[in-house]
Amino acid sequence: MRINFFVEDMLFFKYIGCATVAKTLYRELGKMDDVEVSWKGYGSPADLVHFHTFGPFAATKRRVTKGRKVLTAHSTPRINEGNIALAKVINRYYPKIYRRYDHIITISPSCHEEVQRMVPDKPMTMIPNGINRDHFSFGEAKRRAFREEYGIGEDDQVVLTVAQLTPRKGLYDFLTLAARCPEKRWVWVGGLPYGAMSKNYRRIKRIKRHPAENVIFTGHIPDISDAYSGADVFLLPSYAETFGLVILEALSCGLPVIARNIPEYYGIFDDQILFFEDNDEVVGLLDETSLLRQKAASAREFSARYDIRSIAAQHLALYRELLES
C-alpha cells in the first residue's frame, strides 16, 4: 500500500496545527509494516493521497493524482470567523471543495456534524488527532532553560497559551486577563501564519511590539514542549476549534488546562479540562491551587487515549478499507 501525504506547509504555514498533525501521523505510519509513505511531491506514485490542506498547490496535486483522494477536515467555516479576513467570502467555497475528495476524515464530534451539514452526500469517518507522547512530556531541564531564556523567575506562576495571534484564539481576553492578574506571567507562543490576511493584522502587530510588563510574546519557537514544561497552567481562550490539539499537547506534558466552554471539546476532553464562560471564572480558577494540582496529576494519563500509535493504526485501517472497496 502506497500512501502519499500532501500538506501546504511552506513559509509560515509550517507552524499551523494541521501541518504538525500531518507530520506526526506521517512519521508514525512510516514505522509500520505493509505501507509505504511519501511526503508531498507531484510525481510520487500512490494508491491513496491523504490531503491535510486544500489550497492551490493541493488542488493541483488533486487534479493530477490517480489514487483515492482523502481530506482531513482540519479547517471548517466555523473556525475562519475572527481568524482571517474575508472569512465569509472564503467560507462559500467549502462545500464545492470538499465534494472533490473521495472521503473526508473529521477530527471531533462537532467537526463531524458541521461537515455533514455542509456535504451530507460525502462519505466520512471520524478519527481524532494524535500526538507523540514521548516528545510531549515534562522535562525539568526544559523548564529551567525556557524560564532562563525569557527572564521568568523560578517562583513565578506562568500562564501559557499556544495559538495563532488572532481574535478567534481569544487574544484580547488573554490581554485583559493579564491586566487583571499582574502578579502572574502570561506567555503566548505563536505568530501570524496568514500574514496580512490575518484578522486585525495591524492592530495585533502593534500589540506585539508593545506588550505589558507581565506579557511575553515568544513568536514561534523551535520546540514548544519547552514552553509546556516551563509553564504552570495552560489557557486556551479560543472561541472556535475543530479539535484543540494544543490542549492535548499540554495535557501530555502534565499541565492543568483551562479552556473556554465551546462544543468542539465535548466528547474529546470530558471533565479533564476546566471550562470557563467568562474572564471572571478564569481569574477564580487560577487561584484554585488544589483543583489545578488535581487536574495536573491526571493530565498525562488522560492523554494516552490519543497516543499517535493508536491514531495511526486507525488511519491505516481506513486506508485499507477504502482501497479494498
Specify the residue positions occupied by each region the protein language model found.
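Aromatic "clamp/platform" in nucleotide-sugar-dependent glycosyltransferases that forms part
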Residues: 220, 239
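A conserved mid-protein helix/loop that constitutes part of the nucleotide-sugar donor-binding site
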Residues: 20, 157-160, 166-180
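A charged, aromatic-enriched C-terminal amphipathic alpha-helix characteristic of glycosyltransferases
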Residues: 17-20, 291-324
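A short, active-site helix/loop in glycosyltransferases that binds the activated sugar's phosphate group
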Residues: 99-125, 131-135
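Glycosyltransferase donor-sugar binding loop
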Residues: 131, 162, 185-201
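Conserved acidic donor-binding segment of nucleotide-sugar-dependent glycosyltransferases
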Residues: 270-291
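Membrane-proximal helix-turn-helix segments that form the acceptor-binding/catalytic region
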Residues: 87-104, 205
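Short hydrophobic beta-strand element within catalytic cores of glycosyltransferases
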Residues: 256-259
